[in-house]
Each structure stands twice: as C-alpha cells, then as structure tokens.
Amino acid sequence: MQLPHILQLLVLITLANGTPIVAKKIFGPRFSFPMDAGTVFFDGRPLFGPSKTIRGILVSVLITTASAPLIGLDLTIGAIVAGAAMAGDLFSSFVKRRLNSPPSSQVLGLDQVPESLFPMLACRGALSLTIADIALGVGIFFIGALILSRFLFRAHLRDEPY
C-alpha cells in the first residue's frame, strides 16, 4: 500500500478541483470563457455547460503543477494530476448534460469519482499504485469531497452545498 503517495495525490486532486472554485470567487465573470465556447452537442444540449471555463482549467493546471514540489512530488506529476482531474470534471459535466441535469447540479458519484479516478489512474505507473491504492484514494476523495463541499458552501466559496 502506497499510503504516502495516496495522501499526496489527494492533496493535489483537492487542489486541482478546488482552484477553479476559488478563481471564480476572486475573478467573478472576468476571464470566464466557457470551455465548450457555447457548442451544442447533436442532442441539442451544451457540450459541457457555462461553468466549465478555460480560466478554471488553466488556474487548476498552473497552481497544482506549482504545488506538487511543495509536497515532494515532481512538477510533471502535478500537471498530470491537474489535467486528469479536469478531464474527469469535463467528463462528468458532459455526462450530466446528456442526462439533462442542470449546470452545477449534483449527481452523487458522477461528481466525485471521475475527478479522482482519472488522476489516480494517470499516476498509477509513476507512483506504483495498485488497484487497492486507487480504490482507497477514490473512496477517501468521495467522502472528503462531500464533507468539504458543505464547508466551502458555508464559507461562501461554493454556490451550492455539494
């Protein structure tokens, strides 16, 4: 079991997923360009929706990459974690649009699992993670994200308590 690596990844995954939320509060609507540029999929629904922005992805990648050495990981791992976490977030947003869920709505599991599973899988080889390590990391993130979201809502950093 690679517990130190799991914990390091959880820090980076939390950072990768949290920095776009903080950037939204700091910048408001400034620099908020939708990742899908308003593209509509063949089903008539947005590709990702307005809450997935280029600003959020750039801030996530920059901050997470720069933070990785502070917890003993390589810059490359930070970039991989951020990119994979954002890919997971975009994946869940895409699926939610296909399910006709409103933007920023909660779909339990779909909101937490891809955001943590994708980065864990992406770092599996570099950090010698086992399937058990990945399952544990995703499980911890799932529970932690539900708890942390409520605190962020109370601190007025999130618009919804999930």
Report residues per predicted region.
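Interhelical loop and helix-boundary elements at the membrane-water interface
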Residues: 1-80, 86-122, 131-162
